[in-house]
């Protein structure tokens, strides 16, 4: 089944075909590091982490770049208010970003460029636009001449006339046309600056990403992503610069995730509904937010509320319990007269999952397939308990179902990182009662139990102890380790 992706540029789903077979180059616009990350940032991070993981699952070598905007008006203003160098502010919030990303198991990008370490590349990029006649200097500022790029507006589906109606030249700006945008800003008193052919200054936001993409990924990439709010003007302006310079498509596929509201309202500090990621993981396991984000299609709006977090927590517990409950069945007597297994349900769930994911990363439908498997697992478990026994085939099928849930959740959705998929046979399997148990195996099981206890997997630890007791081996926990003796 081929992967289909909704392309913002064309407004339709398209078969995914990377430029180089087997390789995918992705760039997503990162955060401007002037404040703590909020739930909107979290959604974008989780969405593109999921996309990256699924592409990798499909066998692609994914080269993923996400930048940091570490010099900007907001950073400079905060630095002034706190009487600190701008770099102290940006360094602080880059560290906060990495802390949040680690908590939510966002895989680090392969390359994470910072604007301030790419100033020569940005200046060189701007100079090429000036030389090509698409940009002009005006008293130390450099602007892009929008009307010279005839396809301007093709991403956001806006015409020049529409844009002109709301455009104006701000006091102090020296651009020739209200539509033109800044590539280089001349230095102001008390602000950071770099030397350039046009004098002291700093780069404009829209040109930074272009220069970093050209440096690290080339002139045409496979996927460019970001939040829906970046479609215009940021991504529109990126296309104009890059394609004016090369005459080639800048990105084959443009992917934008929907925005986040809070209780139906736009998130803002003035409304008091600005939800930081720190606040979320102080109250919930990070997996809960990941699951909430994935329960809504990435292109749809996501309305965040604490009530929805509670609902999602309950759904997460259903998944988690299904994965962990293999030991319940292990405690039942073996009865080969028990009928039923989960192999067909596993196949159906896998097929449904990958079909949904290959249809523009339809995570709600993919999750529905997983919860369908959970339902079948619960039915089998309840039937076996009522029956008072279970066949070996049924137990193994349950373990396989638990492993399927765990591995898909971990590898593609970034869930269950510390969860045991099921009881590993090599950790808990003991010989039949009539056979003796050797000391090497006892020691292996003691070590496995100790590991489970350290990871707070107490159910598994207790099961190992009980299984050894069935063999006549009694464990005695002491401050300096666990000892054993025969009953």
UniProtKB/Swiss-Prot annotation:
InterPro entries linked to this entry: Cys-tRNA-ligase, Cys-tRNA-synt_Ia_DALR, Cys-tRNA/MSH_ligase, Rossmann-like_a/b/a_fold, tRNA-synt_1_cat_dom, tRNAsynth_Ia_anticodon-bd
UniProt remark on cofactor binding: Binds 1 zinc ion per subunit.
GO BP annotation list: cysteinyl-tRNA aminoacylation
SUPFAM superfamilies to which the protein is assigned, alphabetical: Anticodon-binding domain of a subclass of class I aminoacyl-tRNA synthetases, Nucleotidylyl transferase
Residue span of motif 'KMSKS' region: 266-270
Predominant localisation class: cytoplasm
Catalytic reaction(s) noted: tRNA(Cys) + L-cysteine + ATP = L-cysteinyl-tRNA(Cys) + AMP + diphosphate
Binding site for ATP: 269
Top enzyme category: ligase
Superkingdom of the organism of origin: Bacteria
Protein name: Cysteine--tRNA ligase
Organism: Sulfurihydrogenibium sp. (strain YO3AOP1)
Name of the gene encoding the protein in the UniProt record: cysS
């Amino acid at each position: 089944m081929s992967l289909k992706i909704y392309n913002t540029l064309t407004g339709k789903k398209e078969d995914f075909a990377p430029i180089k077979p087997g390789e995918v180059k992705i760039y997503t616009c990162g955060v401007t590091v002037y404040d703590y990350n909020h739930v909107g940032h979290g959604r974008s991070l989780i969405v593109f982490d999921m996309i990256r993981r699924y592409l990798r699952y499909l066998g692609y070598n994914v080269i993923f770049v996400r930048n940091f905007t570490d010099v900007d008006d907001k950073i400079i203003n905060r630095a002034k208010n706190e009487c600190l160098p701008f770099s102290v502010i940006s360094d602080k919030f880059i560290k906060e970003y990495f802390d949040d990303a680690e908590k939510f198991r966002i895989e680090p990008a392969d390359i994470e460029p910072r604007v301030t370490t790419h100033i020569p590349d940005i200046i060189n990029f701007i100079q090429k636009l000036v030389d090509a006649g698409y940009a002009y200097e005006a008293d130390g500022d450099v602007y892009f001449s929008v009307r010279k790029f005839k396809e301007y507006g093709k991403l956001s589906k806006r015409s020049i006339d529409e844009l002109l109606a709301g455009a104006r030249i701000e006091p102090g700006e020296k651009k020739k046309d209200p539509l033109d945008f800044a590539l280089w800003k001349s230095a102001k008193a008390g602000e950071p600056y770099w030397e350039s052919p046009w004098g002291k200054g700093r780069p404009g936001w829209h040109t930074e990403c272009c220069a970093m993409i050209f440096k690290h990924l080339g002139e045409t990439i496979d996927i460019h992503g970001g939040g829906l709010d970046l479609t215009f003007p940021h991504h529109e302006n990126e296309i104009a610069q890059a394609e004016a310079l090369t005459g080639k498509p800048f990105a084959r596929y443009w992917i934008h995730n929907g925005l986040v509201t809070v209780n139906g309202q736009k998130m803002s500090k003035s409304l008091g509904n600005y939800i930081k990621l720190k606040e979320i993981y102080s109250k919930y396991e990070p997996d809960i937010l990941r699951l909430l984000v994935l329960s809504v299609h990435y292109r749809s709006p996501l309305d965040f509320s604490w009530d929805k977090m509670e609902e999602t927590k309950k759904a997460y517990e259903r998944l988690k319990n299904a994965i962990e409950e293999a030991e319940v069945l292990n405690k039942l007597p073996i009865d080969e007269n028990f009928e039923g297994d989960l192999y067909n349900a596993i196949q159906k769930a896998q097929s449904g999952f990958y079909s949904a994911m290959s249809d523009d990363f339809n995570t709600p439908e993919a999750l529905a397939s997983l919860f369908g498997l959970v339902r079948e697992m619960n039915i089998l478990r309840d039937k076996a308990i009522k029956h008072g026994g279970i066949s070996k085939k049924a137990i193994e099928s349950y373990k396989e179902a638990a492993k399927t849930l765990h591995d898909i959740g971990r590898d593609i959705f970034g869930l269950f990182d510390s969860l045991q998929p099921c009881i590993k046979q090599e950790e808990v399997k003991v010989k039949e009662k009539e056979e003796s148990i050797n000391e090497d195996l006892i020691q292996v099981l003691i070590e496995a139990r100790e590991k489970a206890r350290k990871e707070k997997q107490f159910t598994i630890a207790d099961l190992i102890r009980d299984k050894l007791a069935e063999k006549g081996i009694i464990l005695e926990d002491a401050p300096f380790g666990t000892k054993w003796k025969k009953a």
